[in-house]
Amino acid sequence: MYRKQPLESLCRDLRNGTVSAAEIREQALSAEARLKHLNCFIRDGDAEEQFSKASDAFKGGALWGIPVSFKDNICVKDLPVTAGTPGMTGCIATHDAFIVKKLKSLGAVVAGKNNMHELSFGITSVNVQWGTAGNPAAPGYCAGGSSGGCVSRPWSAGLYRSPSDTGGSVRIPAAFCGIAGFRPTTGRWASSGIIPVSHTKDAPGLLTRTVKDAAFLYGLISGSNTGEPSCEVRKLPCRVGLPASLWTGLDDHVERACFTAIRRMQDAGFDCVELDDGGIYALNETLTFTIPLYEFFTDFPRALLGLGWEQKIDAVFSHIADPHVRKIIHAHLAEELISRAEAASAVRDIGRLRLQMNALFQRQNIGLLAYPRHRVTSPCQVPPLSHVTGRSFFAEVIVNTDLASNAALPSVSLPVAPPGALPVGLSFDAPTGQDLFLLKTAAHIEMLLGTSEPDIRTYW
């Protein structure tokens, strides 16, 4: 009933009493039961018990009665947190992560915890323990990851998701499933209460039906004191840079969908120009694995220590269920594959990259970068780490997402494939700190393209 209704409109109807919070909750629970095969939730017990009810204490809140679910590496008080790995079974969060606390204070209700790739170490959301997250827009195709469970639920009853993103874990699933995925400027929202991969790169994000909904949520979560320039003083349409390195090696379907979107933007007055980003691209490629793989082995145990779960550290590493994740982690535990000198060099270089990216925006007088979110379409056989055109599937997918993560840029993916086709995401990035400008401009582009409704006819 509420699948196509903008979030702001639905919130208004809840406040006016046109729609009841109980009705939304019941519809969401009904949809979860009907679509259990998509493995979107990690449940320890009854869904009815874990799906909160709207509290009268927050009835005046802007999101009162709106269900929000969280990736299962995000702490929600009194709910289990597994990070998708069996070794964390029995861990119950004693407090809320920052993003959870903020959404609860606005009146949102917790719908549960979403399935994910084990320990966030992958982009397919194949999970040996809790099942592979399904793709509601393209049944049988990969949902992406590591936050795949957050997108594997069709957008019924106003249900929204908050995942985390290290190198693309929000934006990859959004692109593969035909919805909007937003990663804020690194550090804009605190990552406290999130089981980490890398403190340098991790950020909480949003998965929403549309970019317009993401912009609405961003404004509520961040408030008015963001220090960002007013969007009203920025000229639209703006100048958009197309980084040449991120437009190469595309599948025909991806290339066609993304260039069609760019041409429509140009017809609407956007000045889209190709950029020579070769030096930046080469620098970024040296950073993809070094920092997260080095930081994980201190950040993850330290997080468990801070949560009082230090006794679980050995159990987690000993009981990793996914053979590919286990191989990676055990190889790094057995031997120092990344030296301290290499890690220090990578931190220095990530600082250089961030300076160079923001200088690029200024030098080229561009407001946004635009590029395909992924170079390949979602595979119909969901591989843990299979090979595509001679490169690992992981490397092929993450190559266009990791730049924004390393450069600390706000980034959003919006769907651009025609109805009935496999989903394709077009990515937009803005300079550091210009999150609201990014979201409002991308929402304007979304309206121009008319691609704001995910194609999930199979389930409705």
From Swiss-Prot:
Alphabetized UniProt keyword annotations: Auxin biosynthesis, Hydrolase
Positions annotated as active site in the UniProt record: 71 (charge relay system), 146 (charge relay system), 169 (acyl-ester intermediate)
Annotated pathway: Plant hormone metabolism; auxin biosynthesis
Claim: Translocase is one of the keywords in the record: no
E.C. number(s) listed in UniProt: 3.5.1.-
Origin: domain of life: Bacteria
Pfam families: Amidase
GO molecular function, one term: hydrolase activity
A Gene Ontology BP annotation from the UniProt entry: auxin biosynthetic process
Top EC class, one word: hydrolase
Role according to the record: Hydrolyzes indole-3-acetamide (IAM) into indole-3-acetic acid (IAA).
Membership in a protein family: Belongs to the amidase family.
Protein name listed in UniProt: Indoleacetamide hydrolase
UniProt lineage: Bacteria, Pseudomonadati, Pseudomonadota, Gammaproteobacteria, Enterobacterales
Gene name in the database record: iaaH
